[in-house]
Curated annotation (Swiss-Prot):
Note on domains (UniProt): There are 3 rolling circle replication (RCR) motifs. RCR-2 is probably involved in metal coordination. RCR-3 is required for phosphodiester bond cleavage for initiation of RCR.
Principal location: host cell
Residue positions binding a divalent metal cation: 49, 57, 59, 107
Region listing for Binding to RBR1, in residue ranges: 143-153
Classification lineage: Viruses, Monodnaviria, Shotokuvirae, Cressdnaviricota, Repensiviricetes
Motif RCR-1 mapped to chain: 15-19
Name by which UniProt lists this protein: Replication-associated protein
Cofactor binding annotation: Divalent metal cations, possibly Mg(2+) or Mn(2+).
Keyword Lipoprotein: no
Organism in which the protein naturally occurs: Tomato yellow leaf curl Sardinia virus (isolate Spain-1)
Motif residue range(s): RCR-3: 103-106
GO BP of this protein: DNA replication
Protein role: Essential for the replication of viral ssDNA. The closed circular ssDNA genome is first converted to a superhelical dsDNA. Rep binds a specific region at the genome origin of replication. It introduces an endonucleolytic nick within the conserved sequence 5'-TAATATTAC-3' in the intergenic region of the genome present in all geminiviruses, thereby initiating the rolling circle replication (RCR). Following cleavage, binds covalently to the 5'-phosphate of DNA as a tyrosyl ester. The cleavage gives rise to a free 3'-OH that serves as a primer for the cellular DNA polymerase.
Database matches in InterPro entries: CRESS_DNA_REP, Gemini_AL1_CLV, Gemini_AL1_REP, Gemini_AL1_REP_central
Subcellular localization(s) per the UniProt record: Host nucleus
Length: 359
């Protein structure tokens, strides 16, 4: 007579199902953690569900650091802490931890311990699995959640194509720049020259009312005169200080105008595109794809006097005569000699803003 087959499972990941188990997830986890095994436990996930007959069931995924050769079919038995009852599971080696994890997630009443170990395998296999992974990523609530899904379900793509995946998810989960809230109303700037007020009335407005080619403005003046705070109080805008970042995280194509603050005109990229309110232009990035700029909005250039800041001095350089002739047709130039506000109408301009810009 053939000997009965001995129980033995040699696996790194185990899938346990406890039918009619009244233990809570926390009680089950506490007992599992007390089990002595030759290899360390890395991750445990427990799901509690109620079947149609109302009986509670527990499903568990256990991941070990190395393979665990289990020869005792009672090894994972659990006991009730309040009554004389044992709970015996169905024990299987988990061919795909990702599939088991997804399966026991279905009811939502779960408890996790440790860090999930990605195995990169799926019982479903093939192209369908890759499609499922990316579909799940698209349906995730955020970029970080989508990256976690791809890392778990498509680890090869995650490693080999991370740059493209990361860039594409920036577009899929594009978050518009947080709107700037000015600490001062534009009306609190009571010393604004008439030519600035007139320029605002003619050029700063939403797309429906805006001129097809608005005129930009260059405002030059000493530090702490309120140029930056005034310029930022006029409406929805893009604020670019020190250097130009046209990424979607910073730059919005729905802004009414741009503010370029404290950028040396000698090194100002896209000088004509900004000053000329040009439409539909591209900006090449060093490590990414070109960025499409909708344009058609005016720009406020803020600067201080001096050879490394003043737009007037820059355009007066002999080599820039042609550019100067173009600039005076596309922008007005205003020099201010006193603050745009009085102390009775607002406190001195915040130091934090001025520390980042000498404008």
């Amino acid at each position: 007579m053939a000997q009965p087959k001995r129980f033995q499972i040699n696996a790194k990941h185990y899938f346990l199902s406890f039918p009619k188990c009244s233990l809570s997830k926390e009680e089950a986890l506490e007992q599992l953690l007390q089990l002595q095994t030759p290899t360390n436990k890395k991750y445990i996930k427990i799901c509690r569900e109620l079947h149609e007959d109302g009986q509670p069931h527990l499903h568990m995924l256990i991941q070990f650091e190395g393979k665990f050769n289990c020869k005792n079919n009672r090894f994972f038995d659990l006991v009730s802490p309040t009554r004389s009852a044992h709970f015996h599971p169905n024990i299987q080696g988990a061919k795909s931890s990702s599939d088991v994890k997804s399966y026991i997630d279905k009811d939502g009443d779960v408890l996790e311990w440790g860090t999930f170990q990605i195995d990169g395998r799926s019982a479903r296999g093939g192209q369908q699995t890759a499609n499922d992974a990316y579909a799940k990523a698209i349906n995730a609530g955020s970029k970080s959640e989508a990256l976690d899904v791809i890392k778990e379900l498509a680890p090869r793509d995650y490693i080999l194509h991370f740059h493209n995946i990361n860039s594409n998810l920036d577009r899929v989960f594009q978050v518009p720049p947080a709107p700037y809230v000015s600490p001062f109303l534009s009306s609190s700037f009571d010393q604004v020259p008439d030519e600035l007020e007139h320029w605002v009335s003619e050029n700063v407005m939403d797309a429906a009312a805006r001129p097809w080619r608005p005129v930009s403005i260059v405002i030059e003046g000493d530090s702490r005169t309120g140029k930056t705070m005034w310029a930022r109080s006029l409406g929805p805008h893009n604020y670019l200080c020190g250097h130009l970042d046209l990424s979607q995280k910073v730059y919005s194509n729905n802004a009414w105008y741009n503010v370029i603050d404290d950028v040396d005109p000698h090194y100002l990229k896209h000088f004509k595109e900004f000053m000329g309110s040009q439409r539909d232009w591209q900006s090449n990035t060093k490590y990414g794809k070109p960025i499409q700029i909708k344009g058609g909005i005016p720009t406020i250039f803020l600067c201080n006097p001096g050879p490394q800041s003043s737009f007037k001095e820059y355009l007066d350089e002999e080599k820039n005569q042609t550019l100067k002739n173009w600039a005076i047709k596309n922008a007005i130039f205003v020099t201010i000699h006193q603050p745009l506000f009085t102390n009775t109408n607002q406190d001195p301009t915040p130091h934090r803003q001025e520390e980042t810009s000498e404008a």
